[in-house]
């Protein structure tokens, strides 16, 4: 007997990356050397001191029992200490920090924590596709905020109609941005706080790439903005900062009423994370951060190598200011999907088509800087052999 899925599951958006993975796997099965720049999976190992702490914690029988429903105090206090050290923000570990099963879980569950069916969420376009999943599961409505190059990929609040402002209850933001690589300014975050306060909107800032900023500029935490804690939260994941993507650990910080809503939801959905994972995560946050600085320098060097190689083949591209993604325009005459398919079929280079991140992603592809400089240069060389760009002198200033 086959049982039918619920209406909510049937309405979930198609997982865009599933089709990309299938295409890449097909090429690999055919024996091709594919340079996969299409996904956002960190390629470096978790730092050794974090792994060693995990080993120690796993060996402790106490950690194999049920852990506290709302997360260990050690991890929550470590998150608060991390925010104080890195951003100068004071947080109460018990009321302003919630432990998450990775950043994605928090982002997807938040609409169910705060919204009722039919409520409206403001969502960046292009943006992280799993935001859409959270909207669907909450039976909410989605209003897109276009992110365009002319506005440095920051939303224009003045273009949001009075009707939508009245209806909106929640807003997602994400800087450094996936997929564009843009960063937010303090002025933009100040405008965001004003806009949200005036309209009663809760801001959810996805700070997944908070540790990845270039050219000497450290990305800003939204909570550094005066009044931000009154109208929103920030979600931080250890996946990117410490190469812990498979560990599934993160946390939300900020407005106490939102943190309580997250905790209440998770009380009914889960028992908290494996305590050994929480111990290792606390170690990551509290220990020396040299590994983070070294990794950021590695990503910046890769960015420079990739952008230079692209410009040498005539591709007129802009260097990202943050994240480990580059957002690149497709050549004239191609859609995003046509161009990405061409690169995979003819050059054995996988990139993510921009339309997978929303309507305003059309005309771009996203490249992940998640392989060696040599492989990035090789990818650009292969693309150059397709003669898709006019060879010309381009300003090499990054």
Curated annotation (Swiss-Prot):
Q: Which cofactor does it need?
A: pyridoxal 5'-phosphate
Catalysed reaction, written as an equation: 4-methylsulfanyl-2-oxobutanoate + L-glutamine = 2-oxoglutaramate + L-methionine
Q: Name one Pfam family in it.
A: Aminotran_1_2
Give one GO term, molecular function aspect.
transaminase activity
* Keyword list, A-Z: Amino-acid biosynthesis, Aminotransferase, Methionine biosynthesis, Pyridoxal phosphate, Transferase
Q: Which GO terms describe its biological process?
A: L-methionine salvage from methylthioadenosine
Matching CDD domains? AAT_like (cd00609)
Its UniProt pathway annotation is: Amino-acid biosynthesis; L-methionine biosynthesis via salvage pathway; L-methionine from S-methyl-5-thio-alpha-D-ribose 1-phosphate: step 6/6
- Domain of life, per UniProt, equals Bacteria
> In the Enzyme Commission scheme, what number(s) does this protein have?
2.6.1.117
Q: What happens when the gene is disrupted?
A: Disruption mutant grows more slowly than the wild type strain on methylthioribose (MTR) as the sulfur source.
Q: Give all N6-(pyridoxal phosphate)lysine modified positions.
A: 240
Biological function: Involved in the methylthioribose (MTR) recycling pathway. Catalyzes the formation of methionine from 2-keto-4-methylthiobutyrate (KMTB).
Concerning NCBIfam families, the annotation shows:
PRK08068.1
Q: Which family does it belong to?
A: Belongs to the class-I pyridoxal-phosphate-dependent aminotransferase family. MtnE subfamily.
Full protein name: L-glutamine--4-(methylsulfanyl)-2-oxobutanoate aminotransferase
Q: Which organism is it from?
A: Bacillus subtilis (strain 168)
The taxonomic lineage of its organism, from the top, reads: Bacteria, Bacillati, Bacillota, Bacilli, Bacillales
